[in-house]
Amino acid sequence: MARPVVAIIGRPNVGKSTLVNRLCRSREAIVHDEPGVTRDRTYQDGYWGDREFKVVDTGGLVFDDDSEFLPEIREQAALAMEEASVAVVIVDGQQGITAADESIAEFLRSRPCPTLLAVNKCESPEQGLAMAAEFWSLGLGEPHPISAIHGVGTGDLLDQVLTFLPPKDQEGDEEEPIQMAIIGRPNVGKSSLLNAICGEQRAIVSPIRGTTRDTIDTNIVRENRPWRLVDTAGIRRRRSVNYGPEYFGINRSFKAIDRSDVCVLVIDALDGVTEQDQRLAGRIEEDGRACVVVVNKWDAVEKDSHTMTAMEKELRAKLYFLDWAPMLFTSALTGQRVDSIFALAALAVEQHRRRVSTSVVNEVLKEALSWRSPPTTRGGRQGRLYYGTQVASRPPSFTLFVNDPKLFGDTYRRYVERQIREGLGFDGTPVKLYWRGKQQRDAERDMVRQQNRQS
């Protein structure tokens, strides 16, 4: 059984994301003094005592206004409560009861999910009890005074949360999920793709750029394998982004790339590859992440039997950083080839984690040398490649021992990398090669020997 879910519910700017960060001991949820910063529901891992659970942060609920994203935010909150064991309802103790709080209470009373009422911004325990007493009238049970920013009362609140969770013996050991980050420019269809993959409205979809302002974690299981999908805020040029929620969301997006096992880079089929797409491709390669390139909105392209081949050639010429990444033409709108994303991503992750024995590596290098010898300088010096070994995975990394790294130019280094890929595979993952000279190797050996003598 998956870990139980705790939903955080409340109107805008009452401190929901601050409480999430407090409960999860992190700063993943964006906190900013602008209402409506959180729009989609986002998940984090929570711990208390010997229990583990998922905390889902929802957007601020507003019932007297249907403009912009507010109806979708209400839908996201309703979906969060459907999967939750308990909903923690946050109100502002300093403001007292508002009409919005009463509307939320009415909304919650029609739901089967149990609720806990947390009165936030009660900085002192004595004043907190007096401030919280007013909220009995909401009909949501005992009000618990807390200060999310200082941690006052949050331990007692968590004790109450645990009473609503299913018994621990109903929870099984969970396999660590594969982290898959869905990244791309604004409005290329990342959230639509996430919803198509999950088969539900997990992320708010809108033609307005910047709808997603935070990273959104979604846990699903495909073919008995757990995945954690992260829909990220659209990444734009820094000079196009004002300081505020979108700025923080983009920083979260780069962090999502860093903590992912595989990135799905979404390209708009109508726009083709832009300069920003190229920068993202470079970031993925630089961070050493496995990758699948997904060309979305394929249904909107006028095409014949040669269009896909021609477009792939054009796209790959511009995404040369990711010439090793598989490319898939999809439509989030129609669902075309969406299921194939998992197969390609799973293969890329497998290759990203793969290790090869030293003997196999050197068989490939021997074959490469037989086809093309290292270059010779005008002075008659020729590069010599003695042997190689894999030193790391995630991404696969190899150290090649040579007489002098300076004798191996970029052209020959690319040739060796191609031969390693052709001989060993590694589709969907970058490969790192480290060229180490004989002098450096001997110096390291001498250092080790000296350390052994001293010990």
UniProtKB/Swiss-Prot annotation:
GTP 1 binds at residues 10-17, 57-61, 120-123. Keywords: GTP-binding, Nucleotide-binding, Repeat, Ribosome biogenesis. Disulfide bonds: none annotated. Pfam families: KH_dom-like (PF14714), MMR_HSR1 (PF01926). One of its GO terms (biological process) is ribosome biogenesis. Residues 4-169, 178-353 form the EngA-type G domain. Residues 354-439 form the KH-like domain. GO terms for molecular function: ATP hydrolysis activity; GTP binding; ribosome binding. It comes from the Bacteria. Associates with the 50S ribosomal subunit. Belongs to the TRAFAC class TrmE-Era-EngA-EngB-Septin-like GTPase superfamily. EngA (Der) GTPase family. PANTHER family: GTPASE DER. This is GTPase Der.
